[in-house]
């Protein structure tokens, strides 16, 4: 908890203060710069609530409750969409309304999930002597969490570079990619939930020395992710405009809608690799090899950077549409052999541990 408080305060102050300079550095078009500063600045202001929810969700999953965090995640998504419609349509709050909708939904999700955690798990109620900061625990948590955080940061760097390339294409391209990305984020929430469930499942079964269950779990998760990816891609093909209408006026923004549909098409074709990427990455994290998961983020960053530098200048908007698919495929090419290697390493470790225990067991001679 103390680590979350410290990191959230530092990150909130830093990011809010640097919002405009970062957007200027990314060559954000002048006609949308002020609006972008308002929106992203308010989003950064909600960082403490994001930390709160993720801390609570991680604790719940570690205690064997993987369903409740999913319910709160769904609540956040539905509430966010509802508040978007309320603030933007009747209240006419525009960009500020969209940002506040996100902040409020994340705040409610974080606070309510924390209250639920405290009520359901009495073992977590803190006593007087337990509020002190444990340096040993902080070092251990940072050793696990920093590589995972770096993985997300590295992936985000690739996305920022890609966004810089899109910004050069103009405000229409930016609006199209933004609307399409929000639509994709809405549809890929279940995939992320499958991944987080696999992280917990893999870690628990590793603790029980049941790598056979880990393999079966990964195979089942891949099947579920593949079926969902295909189904969501098909649904998106027929209902893309309807879903995008949640984020923009599809009756007047004809050019943006057309570009957004094209972006969604090329990305949805590659939802299956995205699902596999998420399952393998979270499983590897759950098995304790977070550095490998971070290296997959490096592969994504390299792919997005290459697309931004090479394909976007050559192909324009179509090049930007290929950024996510290229990143997903690059990560999969790395993660699949990494997953196989991880399982073999753990098999060898568990076998060595069993042999060691057998050798240490005292030999009992039968009584005469």
Language model regions located:
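Transmembrane helical elements of multi-pass membrane transporters/channels
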Residues: 42, 53, 76, 105-109, ...
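Alpha-helical transmembrane segments of multipass membrane proteins
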Residues: 13, 21, 55-59, 78-86, ...
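Small-residue-rich hydrophobic transmembrane alpha-helices
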Residues: 1-13, 17-18, 50-69, 176-240, ...
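Short alpha-helical transmembrane segments in multi-pass integral membrane proteins
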Residues: 1-46, 90-146, 202-269, 311-368
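Residue-level hotspots within pore-lining transmembrane alpha-helices
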Residues: 10, 14, 44, 48-49, ...
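Short runs within selected transmembrane alpha-helices of multi-pass transporters and secretion channels
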Residues: 42-61, 69-77, 98-113, 192-195, ...
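Hydrophobic/aromatic end-of-helix segments at the C-terminal termini of transmembrane alpha-helices
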Residues: 19-22, 83, 157-170, 198, ...
């Amino acid at each position: 908890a103390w680590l979350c408080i410290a990191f959230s305060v530092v990150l909130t102050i830093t990011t809010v203060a640097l919002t405009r300079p970062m957007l200027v550095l990314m060559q954000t078009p002048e006609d949308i710069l002020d609006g972008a500063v308002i929106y992203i600045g308010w989003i950064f202001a909600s960082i403490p609530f994001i930390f709160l929810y993720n801390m609570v969700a991680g604790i719940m999953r570690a205690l064997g409750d993987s369903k409740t965090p999913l319910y709160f995640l769904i609540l956040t998504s539905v509430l966010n969409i509802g508040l978007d419609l309320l603030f933007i349509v009747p209240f006419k709050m525009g960009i500020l309304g969209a940002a506040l909708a996100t902040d409020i939904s994340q705040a409610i999700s974080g606070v309510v999930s924390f209250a639920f955690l405290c009520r359901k798990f009495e073992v977590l109620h803190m006593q007087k002597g337990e509020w002190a900061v444990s340096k040993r625990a902080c070092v251990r948590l940072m050793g696990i969490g920093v590589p995972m955080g770096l993985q997300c940061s590295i992936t985000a760097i690739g996305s920022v570079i890609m966004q810089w390339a899109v910004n050069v294409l103009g405000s229409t391209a930016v609006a199209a990619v933004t609307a399409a990305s929000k639509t994709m984020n809405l549809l890929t929430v279940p995939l992320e939930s499958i991944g987080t469930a696999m992280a917990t499942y893999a870690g628990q079964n590793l603790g029980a020395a049941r790598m056979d269950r880990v393999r079966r779990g990964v195979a089942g998760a891949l099947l579920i992710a593949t079926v969902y990816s295909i189904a969501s891609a098909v649904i998106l093909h027929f209902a893309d405009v309807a879903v995008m209408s949640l984020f923009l006026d599809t009756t007047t923004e004809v050019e943006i809608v057309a570009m957004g549909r094209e972006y969604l098409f090329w990305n949805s074709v590659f939802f299956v690799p995205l699902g596999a990427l998420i399952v393998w990455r979270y499983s590897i994290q759950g098995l304790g090899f977070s550095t490998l998961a971070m290296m997959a983020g490096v592969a994504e960053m390299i792919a997005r950077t290459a697309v931004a530098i090479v394909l976007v200048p050559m192909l324009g908007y179509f090049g930007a549409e290929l950024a996510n698919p290229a990143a997903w495929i690059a990560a999969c090419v790395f993660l699949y052999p990494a997953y196989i290697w991880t399982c073999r390493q753990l098999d060898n470790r568990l076998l060595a541990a069993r042999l060691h225990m057998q050798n240490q067991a005292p030999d009992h001679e039968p009584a005469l």
